[in-house]
Swiss-Prot record:
Tissue: Expressed by the venom duct.
Protein name: Delta-conotoxin TsVIA
Signal peptide: none
Superkingdom per UniProt: Eukaryota
Record remark on domains: The cysteine framework is VI/VII (C-C-CC-C-C).
GO molecular function: sodium channel regulator activity; toxin activity
Amino acid sequence: CAAFGSFCGLPGLVDCCSGRCFIVCLL
């Protein structure tokens, strides 16, 4: 969760925790 948050904003990655970014949420 925290890991994805760090990449939030980059293409192909998302922040499942914050819910701000959502492109390809695998987890």
